[in-house]
Amino acid sequence: MQTTLLKPKTIQVEQLAANKAKVTLEPFERGYGHTLGNALRRVLLSSMVGYSATEVTIAGVLHEYSSIDGVQEDVVNILLNLKGVVFKLHNRDEVTLSLRKDGEGPVLASDIQTPHDVEIINPDHVIAHLSQGGKLDMQIKVEKGRGYVPGTMRRYADEPTKSIGRIVLDASFSPVKRVSYTVESARVEQRTDLDKLLVEIETNGAITAEDAVRASAKILVEQLAVFAQLEGGELAAFDAPAPRSAQQFDPILLRPVDELELTVRSANCLKAENIYYIGDLIQRTENELLKTPNLGRKSLNEIKEVLASRGLTLGMKLESWPPAGLDKR
């Protein structure tokens, strides 16, 4: 009698629309289609990493229950429209973006000023409409996250109270909009009691349906790995990334911070925090640097300006940093 469970041998990906696809896998043992299909669906809807606007500051606005002269929408509707903008950040976890527009006409997502490593997936999305003489000036904080996080649940260790004028948004980070699955009958030779799993996925464009399935499957594997070692002990690292060599990084990241020609005070503060290379520096956030002893807002602004002149910003993320063999002085 055969005791080995069948594994899927056929995988088909059918593109239904720009951000919609159907993934078909077969054959499964009877019952496994529903078991795995339901697990994938729940993970896809709840656990995918994405990006969302989390805070907004609008010039001349103290709270969300306001209106702006020359803008057709009130602030509440502007914020609702802003939540529909799909962001994608590369090599960083957060960023603050600016939007400044005046003159009659629509305000689009493409009007948001973005650095080279921030992408707006739906640039034609309408945020507001300006009348003649209207003006809209806002700062938008975008963060990386998972699932849905209400604004009331967010905590700021560096700010015990919410500052006036800063509007905290409910953030929906998930890039997956809809998931459904069906199970049909499959046949292998004489066996007709097998399952075929069809998963239909729609995303917001920040991730493809295929990548979403891969990511959700990896999450399930990581979560289930602990059950294979019920005796106890530490689990082996899952897919630990191989260290990257220095040649795989942008050469500017390997230069010492001394080459930024900062003031002596700023340079000494960075070295006291073991920040020796530009690659070390850009991975720190503004809040982290402000906690550095003797480094104030003036020094922080100096650092930001010097980095901006080289096309860099704070809060960037570098995989496998530092490279192998980099001298930590």
UniProtKB/Swiss-Prot annotation:
GO terms for biological process: DNA-templated transcription. This is DNA-directed RNA polymerase subunit alpha. Residues 1-231 are annotated as: Alpha N-terminal domain (alpha-NTD). Homodimer. The RNAP catalytic core consists of 2 alpha, 1 beta, 1 beta' and 1 omega subunit. When a sigma factor is associated with the core the holoenzyme is formed, which can initiate transcription. InterPro entries: DNA-dir_RNA_pol_insert (IPR011262), DNA-dir_RNA_pol_RpoA/D/Rpb3 (IPR011263), DNA-dir_RpoA (IPR011773), RBP11-like (IPR036603), RNAP_asu_C (IPR011260), RNApol_insert_sf (IPR036643). Its EC number is 2.7.7.6. GO terms for molecular function: DNA binding; DNA-directed RNA polymerase activity; protein dimerization activity. It comes from Variovorax paradoxus (strain S110). The N-terminal domain is essential for RNAP assembly and basal transcription, whereas the C-terminal domain is involved in interaction with transcriptional regulators and with upstream promoter elements. Keywords: DNA-directed RNA polymerase, Nucleotidyltransferase, Transcription, Transferase.
